């Protein structure tokens, strides 16, 4: 503002000068951060942002074994005939975390088609296998509703206890460590094959044949610093952790020993993982096996 263009009274002049000199009137560029955004705030983002691995659809009649089931807390492909998910996809950032206690309220999923058998809270009883979470309880502690959603039996797979409670849990804990260090994650987990070994020995099914025991449990984790426009920020240098674990009580407890490539998981499952990422970057990322820290 050029003051000499106007005749101002002394009071108005003093007020104008004070405003011009005030720090509130100064425009200061925000300090850059690792994400490119100042004061990047964690948000709850699209659970299926990196793509639909199996092309699942909400058509229960024609695709009962690749049924798309979307919830606020996660998205999955569910298999009616196997009584478990093919895969579950979710976003994890500090925005999903809070102080809600573990609810332990295992329950049948009433949102599955009414004509389908719904696996119940006691369906795994006496089987020798844990009710193994795909999307873990501790990833959804922002509210009782969020945590309770992880205890729906549609989110479970029959998992050997050593795998569920130690090896698989170790990676789950490490994922939350990454979040506490300023990252956000996109996670896809699932299982495939038939036949695992629990505390009662080898089995191919439980619950009178209505739930398939998988031979392998797998997970893919894409790690990004907190920011926005997440898919466009994925580069050939983005850290991607992929693991493939045998579903057996004889499994080792160090999750890092079971790291593999995304390509290897795709070959085993037939899925197209990270399909929303550009094909060039996808090819580069999926051929690598992570060798980063594990704790």
Descriptions of predicted regions:
Residues 3-7, 21-295:
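Domain-level detector for secreted/extracellular nuclease and nuclease-toxin modules, and
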Residues 9-12:
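Alpha-helical hydrophobic membrane-insertion segments
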């Amino acid at each position: 503002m050029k003051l000499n263009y106007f005749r101002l009274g002394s009071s108005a002049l003093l007020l104008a000068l004070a405003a011009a000199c005030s720090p509130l009137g100064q425009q200061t560029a925000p300090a850059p951060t690792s994400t490119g955004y100042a004061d990047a705030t964690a948000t709850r983002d699209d659970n299926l942002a990196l793509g639909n691995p199996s092309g699942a659809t909400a058509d229960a009649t024609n695709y009962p074994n690749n049924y798309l089931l979307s919830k606020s807390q996660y998205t999955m492909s569910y298999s009616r005939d196997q009584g478990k998910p093919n895969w579950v996809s979710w976003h994890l950032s500090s925005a999903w975390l809070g102080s809600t206690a573990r609810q332990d309220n295992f329950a049948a999923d009433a949102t599955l088609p009414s004509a389908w058998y719904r696996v119940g809270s006691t369906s795994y009883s006496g089987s020798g296998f844990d009710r193994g979470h795909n999307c873990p309880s501790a990833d959804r502690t922002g509210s009782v509703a969020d945590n309770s959603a992880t205890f729906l039996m549609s989110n479970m797979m029959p998992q050997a206890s050593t795998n569920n409670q130690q090896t698989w849990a170790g990676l789950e804990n490490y994922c939350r460590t990454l979040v506490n260090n300023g990252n956000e994650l996109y996670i896809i987990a699932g299982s495939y094959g038939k036949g695992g070994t629990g505390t009662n020995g080898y089995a191919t099914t439980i619950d009178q044949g209505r739930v398939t025991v998988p031979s392998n449990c797998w997970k893919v984790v894409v790690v990004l610093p907190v920011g926005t426009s997440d898919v466009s920020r994925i580069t050939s240098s983005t850290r991607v952790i992929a693991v493939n674990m045998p579903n057996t009580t004889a499994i080792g407890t160090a999750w890092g020993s079971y790291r593999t490539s995304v390509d290897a998981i795709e070959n085993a499952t037939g899925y197209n993982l990270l399909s929303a990422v550009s094909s060039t970057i996808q090819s580069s990322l999926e051929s690598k096996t992570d060798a980063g820290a594990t704790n």
